[in-house]
Structures are given as structure tokens and as C-alpha cells.
A protein has these predicted regions:
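A conserved glycine-rich
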Residues: 1-106
Length: 106
């Protein structure tokens, strides 16, 4: 059984170079502000991963998993052209500790 009150969110830059990295940073800030708004506890595990604890966190965030796209005029392009950037968001629940020696193998 999963713990619905704990989730780990990892965000990875996809295609888009500097714009994709900037998109990941924007998403991380957005999720951090969302956790503050909901009075959840958040802990940064590394540069692109957050552990969030609060009531029904996993239930509310699980649908955020997947590829997210941003289309904008790039601040990194001298020609001010429109660029598309992608990021991958992975939302995982906290799983209980288990002893692999006791797992039934069919």
C-alpha cells in the first residue's frame, strides 16, 4: 500500500537546450510555491527533485506526471525567435519498506 501523504517529484530537461533548463527551473519554483500555498512540507533532494509531505499529496500531484511543453519567445535567442522546450515530470509515491526474501514468486 502506498502512502498518499508523501510524493517525490523529479523534473528533467528535455529538448530545448538552455530554454529547457530554464523551463525546469520555472516548474520547480511553481511546485515549491504550490506546496507553500497548501501548507505542505517540502525538502529538496537534489537540483531537480523534491520530496513533498502533506495531506493527499500524491493523489493531487500524480496527474502531473508526463511531458510538459513550453512555447515562448526565447530570452536566450538574439533573434528573439519562438522556441519550444520540453520537460519530463515524474511523480512517485512513497512505498513501504519490504523484505525481498519474503516476496512470493509465482
Amino acid at each position: 500500500m502506498i502512502n498518499p501523504n508523501c510524493a517525490t517529484i523529479s523534473i528533467y530537461a528535455g529538448v530545448g537546450g538552455e530554454d529547457a533548463k530554464d523551463w525546469v527551473e520555472m516548474l520547480l519554483r511553481m511546485y515549491q510555491k504550490y506546496t507553500q500555498h497548501n501548507n505542505w512540507k517540502v525538502r529538496s533532494i537534489n537540483d531537480n527533485t523534491l520530496e513533498i509531505i502533506g495531506e493527499n499529496v500524491y493523489g493531487l500531484l500524480k496527474n502531473e506526471s508526463g511531458v510538459h511543453r513550453l512555447i515562448r519567445i526565447s530570452p536566450f535567442d538574439a533573434k528573439k525567435l519562438r522556441h519550444t522546450s520540453f520537460s519530463l515530470i515524474e511523480v512517485l509515491p512513497e512505498l513501504p519498506e519490504s523484505d525481498a526474501r519474503n516476496l512470493p514468486i509465482p
